[in-house]
Amino acid sequence: FSVLAIAVFSENYGKGKKLGDSVVIPFQVNYALGKSGFSLAAGGEANSSAGFGTTLGLTHSKATKEILAISVLSYQLSSAQNVKFFGLYEYKPALTEKWSVYSRLQLTYNQGMAEGFHNRSFLYLRAGLKKGPLGFGLGANFDAYGPSKVARENYGVFTRWEF
């Protein structure tokens, strides 16, 4: 068994720009299917816009000192019947004994099967440095909301801490 939990917080700087303000916390318990990297997943997602939902899915993961790759295909057990793909991919090659490059690609595509249209998608990119549990650098977020894929972009700096 393993646990996957991620917290994503997004807030606009400008007043009156509420599209994209959100907190999303997906979490799941995985049951490994042998040593293939594949797992059956069950969990939920707390979402400041959509509320709470339970999910079932399939996960593939691979983790080394330099690479982290997690792919999750899940189905939300709700009236919306959302099917979601989530991917998180990191590359962290060492520069010295204490420092490494940090790069990350995180994406989601959520399709509402009951309504038959796109609900939410995003692509988050990070590039920077890492020393121990601390990471920092430049980031870009590309978000799309609803069936017409209303877009929001955000560029800036990021910090992160690995627990």
Regions found by a protein language model. Name each.
Residues 25-29, 54-58, 85-89, 125-127, ...:
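Membrane-embedded beta-strands of outer-membrane beta-barrel proteins
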Residues 151-163:
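Outer-membrane beta-barrel "beta-signal"
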Residues 123, 140, 154-156:
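Intrinsically disordered, low-complexity regulatory tails/linkers
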Residues 119-131:
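Short secondary-structure subsegments characteristic of cysteine-rich extracellular domains
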Residues 30-38, 61-67, 92-98, 130-134, ...:
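Outer-membrane beta-barrel channels and translocator barrels
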Residues 1-13, 34-48, 66-77, 101-113, ...:
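Transmembrane beta-strand segments that form the barrel wall of outer-membrane beta-barrel proteins
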Residues 12-21, 44-54, 74-85, 111-119, ...:
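Solvent-exposed loop/turn segments connecting transmembrane beta-strands
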Residues 53-54, 59-109:
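Detector for outer-membrane/organellar transmembrane beta-barrel domains
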